[in-house]
Regions:
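Acidic, metal-coordinating helix/loop segments flanking the phosphotransfer/catalytic sites
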Residues: 29-49
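Two-component/phosphorelay signaling modules centered on CheY-like receiver
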Residues: 9-28, 96
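Receiver (REC) domain active-site loop signature in two-component systems and cognate sites
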Residues: 56
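Conserved acidic segment of CheY-like receiver
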Residues: 1-10, 15-16, 50
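Active-site residues of response regulator receiver
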Residues: 53
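Alpha4 helix (beta4-alpha4-beta5 surface) of REC/receiver domains from two-component response regulators
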Residues: 63, 84-101, 114
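Hydrophobic/aromatic residues positioned on beta-strands within the core alpha/beta folds
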Residues: 80-82
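Acidic catalytic/metal-coordinating carboxylates
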Residues: 32, 60-66
Length: 131
């Protein structure tokens, strides 16, 4: 399972359509990070990847992905934003393995699909050779 979380419904729709080209995944989209977190907690071990926007009402993407990783450290995560994130904050969260990849908005469809495939492959390797 792959989740796309962004408060912009157009983005979730566009990304879902783009990722349908990857046959091995089931995609869920959410515009509310709280609902996405609830869905994740019910299905946490079925998830392979969570893609989240940074700036969302109620729970920002960094906090959201930290909660995801606290529940299942093996799930892969991608953070995306149109805003500049402080390098120190980004590096700290990357080092803690909360964020596995970052995409700067506007995200090109090719870049999105390529990064998702990279993260799916990394998940498979991680399952074979857990650290």
């Amino acid at each position: 399972m792959v989740s796309i979380v962004d408060d912009d419904r157009d983005i979730t729709f566009l990304f879902e359509e783009a990722l349908k080209s990857i046959p091995r995944i089931t995609i869920f989209t959410f515009t509310d990070p709280i609902l996405a977190l609830e869905h994740f907690q019910i299905n946490e071990y079925a998830y392979v990847l969570v893609i989240s926007d940074y700036k969302m009402p109620g729970l920002n993407g960094m906090e959201f992905l930290k909660k995801i990783k606290d529940s299942n450290r093996f799930v892969r995560t991608i953070l995306m934003t149109a805003f500049q994130i402080e390098d120190k904050v980004f590096n700290e969260n990357t080092k803690k393995k909360i964020i596995n990849a970052f995409l700067q908005k506007p995200v090109g469809i090719h870049d999105l699909v390529k990064e998702v495939e990279t993260q799916l492959d990394a998940y498979e390797m991680q399952k074979k050779f857990p650290s």
